[in-house]
A protein has these predicted regions:
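N-terminal pre-Walker A segment at the start of P-loop NTPase domains
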Residues: 1-14
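Conserved lysine of the Walker
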Residues: 33
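Hydrophobic positions on the alpha1 helix immediately C-terminal to the Walker A/P-loop
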Residues: 36
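Structural recognition of the conserved hydrophobic beta-strand(s) that form the central parallel beta-sheet
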Residues: 74, 101-107, 128
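Conserved catalytic/switch belt of AAA+ P-loop NTPases
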Residues: 85-104, 118
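Short regulatory helix/loop adjacent to the ATP-binding pocket of P-loop NTPases
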Residues: 110-125, 141
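Accessory nucleic acid-recognition modules appended to NTPase machines
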Residues: 160, 164-326
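Domain-level recognition of nuclease-like catalytic cores that cleave nucleotide substrates
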Residues: 364-386
Length: 386
């Protein structure tokens, strides 16, 4: 029997179901949404709109479809029948004090949020479930093997070959999500664009450069990046800015939300190949960045995360404002800590009006403090939030 790994978002979803009539859970395909809501709400009826029979019923006769499901229901992949949202609104309006009525999941954030804002604003709690965090899988094993296989639950639960599993994942994503979100005649061109983006994870976003390399218009490149964001493939990290300087970069950085997917798209076929790959530093940085996003998403909280880059090309990988105050974080994939890694942090910290905490997250195993900078091993990222 497979061991089910508990998800950190679970308690928050249960809390929301006691407070709101509708709970919406978004996130990428195969991040574990269905498994989670089924385990948390076993007494709810369940229907999956990926099933063409159910989807046709929901589209043709939504009133009858909802009527036969009862007052407690989980509807999976709700974006496949978006007209249901207005009918769900009517049912919620009939019993506004009934909480946990509908548990909805979806993997296309753009359409879902548009539908919720139009039909269910104020009635819905919204959370995002990303693939496993490092703490959810118990800290991981070898660094490069962990990053190479990525964090999608099925790869862990079923011991799947990452390259094979992620090739199927990509094909499904292109056929189901991309075709639905945009009129792309040539999916091979979009796949080329996706691979080009993978090679730029952790870099400043340059849509014009991407467009030129892919042979598409700049406007198309921006549209496709928005599609990748809406379907939880990538995320943009905004720049930190303040009135203290007009010379700060205003360009976001782009990160993939799973390192295994990056490795697959780049043709990295083993952990050993990743360990010596020229983009291993960017992939490690991608891992750390997604861990921060997962920390906040798993607690139902909005994150306050930026990158810093000034006119002198000085950079800080991550600026985070949390309950413990502001922290500045450098990210290094090396396994042996070096004091100079913290020097940029100390120089730039003077820009900030308070006294931020300084950290280097690195690829080693020893937690130590050097010259006022704490060096945090990759397995211990969660300790930054304690």
């Amino acid at each position: 029997m497979k061991k089910y790994l508990k998800r950190q978002l679970g308690p928050k979803l249960v809390q929301w179901a006691r407070q709101y009539p509708v709970v919406m859970l978004t996130g990428p395909r195969q991040s574990g949404k269905t498994t989670l809501v089924k385990s948390l709400f076993p007494k709810h009826a369940y229907v999956n709109l990926e099933n063409p029979v159910e989807r046709d019923y929901a589209t043709v006769d939504p009133v009858a479809f909802l009527g036969q499901l009862g007052r407690r229901v989980v509807i999976d992949e709700i974006q496949r029948a978006p007209t249901l949202l207005s009918h769900i609104q009517s049912m919620v309006d009939e019993a506004p004090d009934e909480h946990g009525h509908f548990i909805l999941t979806g993997s296309q954030n753009l359409q879902l949020m548009r539908g919720v804002s139009q039909s269910l604003a104020g009635r819905t709690a919204i959370g995002s479930l990303l693939p496993f965090s490092i703490s959810e899988i118990g800290g991981g094993g070898n660094l490069w093997k962990t990053l190479w296989q990525g964090f999608f639950p099925r790869i862990f639960h079923d011991n799947l070959d990452p390259t094979e599993a992620l090739s199927f994942y990509t094909a499904t994503y292109l056929e189901r999500d991309v075709r639905e979100l945009v009129k792309v005649r040539d999916l091979s061109r979009f796949l080329q664009f996706l691979r080009l983006c993978a090679g730029r994870t952790g870099q400043l976003l340059n849509a014009a450069n991407l467009a030129a390399d892919c042979g598409i218009a700049g406007k198309t490149a921006l549209e496709w990046i928005s599609i990748l964001e809406a379907s939880y493939i990538v995320r943009r990290l905004p720049p930190w800015f303040a009135n203290v300087s007009k010379r700060l970069s205003k360009t976001p950085k782009m990160y993939f939300l799973d390192t295994g997917l990056v490795c697959y798209l780049l043709g990295i076929s083993s952990a050993d190949q990743l360990a010596s790959h020229p983009l291993r530093g960017a992939i490690f940085e991608t891992f750390v960045m997604t861990e921060f996003w997962k920390h906040y998403a798993n607690r139902g909280m909005a994150d306050k995360i930026w990158h810093y880059r000034d006119g002198g090309q000085r950079e800080i990988d991550l600026v985070n404002e949390g309950s413990a105050g502001r922290m500045l974080v450098e990210i290094k994939s090396g396994q042996t800590p070096h004091a100079e890694w913290g020097e940029t942090l100390k120089r730039i910290s003077a820009v900030f009006p308070d006294a931020p905490q300084l950290y280097v997250v690195y690829g080693g195993t020893s937690d130590q403090i050097r010259g006022g900078v704490r060096f945090v091993p990759w397995r211990s990222i969660d300790s930054l939030f304690v």
